[in-house]
């Protein structure tokens, strides 16, 4: 998955001297589109302060699709809403194109929010207005002339594939079509950044794939930076370039999607990604023991391949190295960002090698291999 180099006009409301000073202090800002520096957010309630975010230090690059995942209450929504200042941080800074948006007055915030589109889980369409009117409304509010509005709405409806639905009302649309209207409306001011807050969680799997395809096309054609939060790990796998994992308002893991999904390091990441993993079949798990019960007992190995060549892991070499009778009980290989990610559960019986030797041989060909136990 490759983000295009085409870029939108950067948000620029401060002087060159300040930007130069920021770039000198933080060289990585020359590349980052959105930068969080030591960001924190604390809510104050009747039972005292609750820290939603703490010590967030993170960069989102121009033109990438960046995913944020975490359990409920991890701080995902709080983080994404600091980008357009719907949430005011308690401490730290958010920079967009090297500009500290915490220093913006109300007029500059209005301009900022026009340059940052946002789509939501529940579409937020006006039921009394048709598709055309829903998309046109932000332009009308901004005082854009009628002819210019008409051209823009027509272009956007064609982009999202709804040019034949322009007179339809929300009640006449499917969930996917409503979200396409929401996406078109979010793009009316030619944003440089698009925020997606659980944008597919109310959709069925087929419609979800359709919306992801549209977001991918928008990213590639317009060069948009897309930041999304979701509880659907498959969405991150299918569309994002990089991902960050939050837990209790802290970053616990981040990296390219193929790396985090292929070999998660933190327990929270492993838990979140568990539904995508293949486990030991129940009939084998019930017979598993730490020690062999018979001379012909089979040793079970849990083997992971992460980011190997596009052709995939060399299973023939692995089976030969293990020796004996090798069976694939569960698993498979998928491709994420043009890299092969594999998870295999193998049964090895009659091998001339000891348990430790088998494990060592497996680890010469796979980044991660563990002994599950014996069957038989």
UniProtKB/Swiss-Prot annotation:
Principal localisation: membrane
Coiled-coil segments: none
EC number: 7.4.2.11
Catalyses which reaction(s): L-methionine(out) + ATP + H2O = L-methionine(in) + ADP + phosphate + H(+); D-methionine(out) + ATP + H2O = D-methionine(in) + ADP + phosphate + H(+)
Region feature Disordered, mapped onto this chain: 1-25
Location of the ABC transporter domain: 34-273
CDD domains in the cross-refs: ABC_MetN_methionine_transporter
Enzyme's top EC category: translocase
Localization, UniProt: Cell inner membrane
Pfam family, one: NIL
Similarity comment text for this entry: Belongs to the ABC transporter superfamily. Methionine importer (TC 3.A.1.24) family.
Cross-referenced PANTHER family: AMINO ACID IMPORT ATP-BINDING PROTEIN (PTHR43166), METHIONINE IMPORT ATP-BINDING PROTEIN METN (PTHR43166:SF30)
Protein name: Methionine import ATP-binding protein MetN 2
Phylogenetic lineage: Bacteria, Pseudomonadati, Pseudomonadota, Gammaproteobacteria, Pseudomonadales
């Amino acid at each position: 998955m490759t983000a295009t180099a085409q870029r939108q006009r950067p948000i620029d409301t401060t002087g060159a001297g300040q930007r130069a000073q920021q770039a000198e202090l933080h060289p990585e800002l020359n590349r980052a589109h959105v930068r969080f520096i030591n960001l924190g957010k604390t809510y104050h309630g009747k039972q005292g302060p609750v820290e939603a975010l703490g010590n967030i230090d993170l960069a989102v690059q121009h033109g990438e699709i960046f995913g944020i995942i975490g359990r409920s209450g991890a701080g995902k929504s709080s983080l994404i809403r600091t980008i357009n200042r719907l949430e005011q941080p308690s401490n730290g800074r958010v920079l967009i194109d090297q500009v500290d948006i915490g220093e913006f007055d109300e007029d500059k915030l209005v301009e900022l929010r026009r340059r940052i589109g946002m789509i939501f889980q529940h579409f937020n369409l006006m039921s009394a207005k048709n598709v055309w009117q829903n998309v046109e409304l932000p332009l009308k509010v901004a005082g854009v002339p009628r002819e210019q509005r008409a051209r823009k709405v027509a272009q956007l409806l064609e982009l999202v594939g709804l040019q034949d639905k322009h007179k339809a009302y929300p009640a006449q649309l499917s969930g996917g079509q409503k979200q396409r209207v929401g996406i078109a409306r979010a793009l009316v001011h030619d944003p440089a950044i698009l925020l997606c807050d659980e944008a597919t969680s109310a959709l069925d799997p087929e419609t979800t794939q359709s919306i992801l395809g549209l977001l991918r096309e928008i990213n590639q054609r317009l060069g948009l930076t897309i930041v999304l939060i979701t509880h659907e790990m498959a969405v991150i796998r299918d569309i994002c370039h990089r991902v960050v994992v939050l837990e209790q308002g802290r970053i616990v893991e981040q990296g390219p999607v193929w790396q985090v999904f292929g070999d998660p390091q933190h327990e929270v990441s492993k838990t979140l990604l568990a539904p995508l993993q293949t486990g030991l079949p129940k009939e084998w798990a019930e017979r598993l023991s730490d020690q062999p019960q018979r001379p012909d007992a089979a040793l079970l190995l849990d083997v992971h391949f992460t980011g190997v060549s596009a052709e995939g892991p060399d299973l023939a070499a692995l089976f030969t190295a293990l020796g004996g009778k090798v069976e694939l009980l569960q698993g498979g290989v998928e491709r994420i960002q043009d890299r092969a990610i594999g998870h295999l559960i193998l049964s090895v019986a009659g091998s001339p090698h000891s348990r430790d030797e088998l494990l060592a041989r497996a680890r010469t060909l796979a980044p991660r291999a563990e002994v599950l136990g014996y069957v038989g």
